[in-house]
A protein has these predicted regions:
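Structural microenvironment flanking redox-active thiols in thiol-disulfide oxidoreductases
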Residues: 37-74
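Structural beta-sheet core signal
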Residues: 27-29, 61, 103
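A short, hydrophobic beta-strand/beta-hairpin element that forms part of a small beta-sheet core
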Residues: 6, 99-113
Length: 130
């Protein structure tokens, strides 16, 4: 069924929802409130992102935090990926973890992980990216 009231926008307000949902594979790091996000996993996230980039797999962040807060967070944690913006209630409904990781294949949820259970890239590659 179609998803209603779900939008992903860029910093400049451009709606990129359709683009994201059409991607072959895309990881979404969902952090509904970036300031309350568990920061202890950022090193692991950055390593995962690096491996995604080497393998040509898309990786983006989704948050409802203000753009200035996001830029400050990205700079502080050397995040090598872009954050996009979605309603906070929608993000909490998607995954009950801050942050949480989701894998979409052409808009279909293939995997979801709480930050305590983030997989390694090799695990994901062997199970989901065939």
């Amino acid at each position: 069924p179609p998803i209603h009231d779900f939008t992903i926008t860029s910093t400049d307000g451009t709606d990129v929802t359709a683009d994201v949902l059409q991607m072959e594979n895309v990881f979404l790091l969902v952090a509904y409130d970036i300031n309350k996000s568990d920061k202890s996993v950022q090193g692991q996230v950055n390593d995962f992102v690096s491996l995604c980039q080497k393998a040509g797999v898309e990786f983006i962040g989704l948050t409802s935090s203000a753009p200035k807060e996001v830029e400050s967070f990205r700079h502080e944690h050397n995040s090598g990926f872009e954050y996009y913006f979605t309603d906070g209630t929608t993000l909490k409904t998607m995954i009950r973890s801050n942050p949480g990781l989701m894998l979409l294949k052409k808009g279909k949820v293939e995997g979801m992980w709480h930050y305590n259970d983030f997989p390694t890239f090799d695990e994901v590659k062997s199970h989901y990216l065939k």
